[in-house]
Amino acid sequence: MIKRVIENLARAGVDRIVVNVHHFAGQIIDYLNENNNFGLDIRISDETSGLLETGGGIKKAAPLFAPDAPILIHNVDILSNVDLKKFYIAASVREERRVKSEEGVDAVLLVSWRKTKRYLLFDDDMRLVGWTNIETGEVRSPYPELNPKECRMYAFAGIHALSPRLLKMMDQFPDRFGIIDFYLKACATHNIKGYVNDDLKLMDIGKLDTLAQAEEFLEELRVTN
């Protein structure tokens, strides 16, 4: 599936890609070399000594990112029909506004409405304000008086773009941490926005028993596209 993600990123105009490796790191690196890195500038962030989770992986890879452009993060286990170019352009435009000292955004999270247990919470301007587990009733937010019933609830799609400025804030976190934990702290002082894609079709193929379903899902995407 890494080939599909790389090709989708390339079509979106991305020319530098950082790949986090842990399981089967050698095989992944060999595969990239055999394909001449698909003609792109592909750099490896080595996590073979231990998985750093979704936030720690970004922190470790920080020196490998281009220093002056929004960083597009894509979970390799996620299959979707999202237009990555459109999504990244939206993030880039908002970054440009921030540079010009206008209303800007520090991170953009791809979200959609779908049934799940865990939701991100947004205000009416789609600014991130918290997180909730609707099964347990747990709420996490930097705003103590937050009422989830007054918020917009959307599920995170595992694809997001963040400003390089936010990387400095990650120094406050341990080597291993989840990206949602980071955003929930950052949203108290930074503008973290949700990008709603109502027509989003998405599948998480992180488990072996989803491979057959993944083939059907990819075929469906080919037909609809």
Pin down the residues of each PLM region.
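Conserved N-terminal catalytic core of the sugar/cofactor nucleotidyltransferase
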Residues: 1-75, 86, 98-99, 173-174, ...
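Residues at the starts of beta-strands that form the adenosine-phosphate
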Residues: 15-17, 41, 104-107, 191
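Structural beta-sheet core signal
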Residues: 19, 73, 107-110, 194
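A generic "binding-loop/recognition-motif" signal
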Residues: 24, 48, 115-116, 198-201
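Short, well-ordered secondary-structure micro-motifs
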Residues: 30, 55, 83-84, 119-122, ...
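Catalytic-core segments of class I nucleotidyltransferases/pyrophosphorylases
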Residues: 69-72, 79-80, 85-100, 127-225
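Short beta-strand-to-loop element that shapes/binds the nucleotide-sugar donor at the catalytic cleft/hinge
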Residues: 107-125
